[in-house]
Amino acid sequence: MADNNKKPAGLTEKKANRRGAARLAAVQALYQMDIAGAGINDIFAEFESHWLGNEVEGDTYLPAEAAFFRDVVSGVVRDQKKLDPLIDEALSKGWPLKRIEAILRAVLRAGAYELQHRKDVPGRVVVSEYVDVANAFVDREETGMVNAVLDQIGRQFRGDEFGRG
């Protein structure tokens, strides 16, 4: 039986899983900040002490790379005014970012941040990981939108990896 689990080149399984868990946690944290207006320090304290690597309401959350989680969340918060216009430009006409569900805004912002700033992670891995994160929350059509938007942003910031178009 073939192993269909795709791992990013150069990352150990443990590191890849910890980064994937960090991405999922970052999206959840950004969503909570967007919906509830929670502050970044409160979010860090809550997620690092109660969520990452713990059991919550019967679900066990994977241990996450805390530094990666913090970088994505703080980077999105710091750069949101620059990220949102990039995402708006990549979205279909008539669908500005403010009309997109809050969870998808969090996914797109985190993915756009990583594509722009985390050159240590291959761009295609970033897109694939955030499509997987989106898949945990929304249907296939919306994950297709996540793929298309992040691919377009990837071409802008990492044309050498994606091809310029």
Curated annotation (Swiss-Prot):
<dbReference type="InterPro" id="IPR011605">
    <property type="entry name" value="NusB_fam"/>
</dbReference>
<dbReference type="InterPro" id="IPR035926">
    <property type="entry name" value="NusB-like_sf"/>
</dbReference>
<comment type="function">
    <text>Involved in transcription antitermination. Required for transcription of ribosomal RNA (rRNA) genes. Binds specifically to the boxA antiterminator sequence of the ribosomal RNA (rrn) operons.</text>
</comment>
<keyword id="KW-0805">Transcription regulation</keyword>
<dbReference type="GO" id="GO:0031564">
    <property type="term" value="P:transcription antitermination"/>
</dbReference>
<dbReference type="Pfam" id="PF01029">
    <property type="entry name" value="NusB"/>
</dbReference>
<protein>
    <recommendedName>
        <fullName>Transcription antitermination protein NusB</fullName>
    </recommendedName>
</protein>
<dbReference type="GO" id="GO:0003723">
    <property type="term" value="F:RNA binding"/>
</dbReference>
<keyword id="KW-0694">RNA-binding</keyword>
<comment type="similarity">
    <text>Belongs to the NusB family.</text>
</comment>
<dbReference type="GO" id="GO:0005829">
    <property type="term" value="C:cytosol"/>
</dbReference>
<keyword id="KW-0889">Transcription antitermination</keyword>
<keyword id="KW-0804">Transcription</keyword>
<dbReference type="GO" id="GO:0006353">
    <property type="term" value="P:DNA-templated transcription termination"/>
</dbReference>
<dbReference type="InterPro" id="IPR006027">
    <property type="entry name" value="NusB_RsmB_TIM44"/>
</dbReference>
